[in-house]
């Protein structure tokens, strides 16, 4: 991504994985939203599976506890674990534009100037978590990360970390690098998540911060 960005000449950079299938107008909707809302640093579409079911691509920043829960559930998004459900924002209505901590890097739009200001993706991440990291740095620059479900894309996502294999270990290594890089002081940045209760029994009391839809 960083190599491609160096050769980009437009005002905005679209990060797009090769396994993304675009729907009509999806890119235009992201672009139109971005230019109308300069406080938004990163805007990401709704990602769905081939069967049109939702992919939980918008998430909150994890804690070590959530990371361990994800490892124990083998990254299963259908896990009933309350911490995992909170991490995946399953308790929030995700049918309107919403400020979120971070979105999967399979698809998102960012201004060229801001991308350069962030110095792009951290190349010390060999695989995984670099999308979480750039969103975290976006918030630290006082820019928002917005999940924009009016733009829809299909992500032919093949989860490769369902079993404890080499890729799973790389994923875990990237998570721990992210925590170590930020001195293990990770907290939610989106306004509706910042004041969210931390105790497990209260994890479903988050309130969404809905943002303008146009």
Task: Annotate each language-model stretch with its function.
Residues 16-18:
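Catalytic metal- and UDP-sugar-binding loop of GT-A-like glycosyltransferases, i.e.
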Residues 20-21, 125:
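Acidic metal-phosphate-binding loop of nucleotide-sugar-dependent transferases
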Residues 62-100:
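Short, flexible, basic/aromatic active-site loop/helix in glycosyltransferases
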């Amino acid at each position: 991504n960083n190599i491609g960005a160096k050769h980009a000449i437009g005002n905005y950079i679209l990060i797009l994985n090769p396994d993304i299938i675009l729907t009509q107008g999806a890119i235009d909707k992201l672009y139109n939203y971005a230019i109308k809302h300069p406080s938004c640093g990163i805007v990401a579409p709704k990602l769905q599976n081939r069967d049109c079911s939702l992919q939980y691509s918008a998430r909150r920043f994890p804690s070590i506890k959530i990371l361990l829960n994800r490892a124990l559930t083998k990254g299963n998004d259908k896990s009933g674990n309350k911490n995992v459900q909170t991490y995946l924002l399953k308790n929030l209505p995700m049918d309107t534009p919403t400020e979120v901590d971070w979105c999967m890097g399979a698809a998102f739009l960012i201004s060229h100037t801001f991308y350069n200001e962030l110095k792009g993706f951290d190349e010390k991440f060999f695989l995984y978590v670099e999308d979480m990291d750039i969103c975290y740095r976006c918030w630290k620059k006082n820019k928002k990360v917005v999940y924009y479900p009016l733009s829809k894309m299909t992500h032919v996502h093949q989860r490769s970390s369902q079993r404890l294999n080499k890729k799973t270990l790389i994923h875990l290594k990237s998570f721990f690098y992210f925590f170590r890089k930020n001195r293990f002081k990770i907290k939610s940045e989106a306004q509706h998540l910042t004041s969210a209760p931390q105790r497990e029994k209260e994890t479903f009391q988050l309130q969404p911060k809905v943002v303008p839809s146009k």
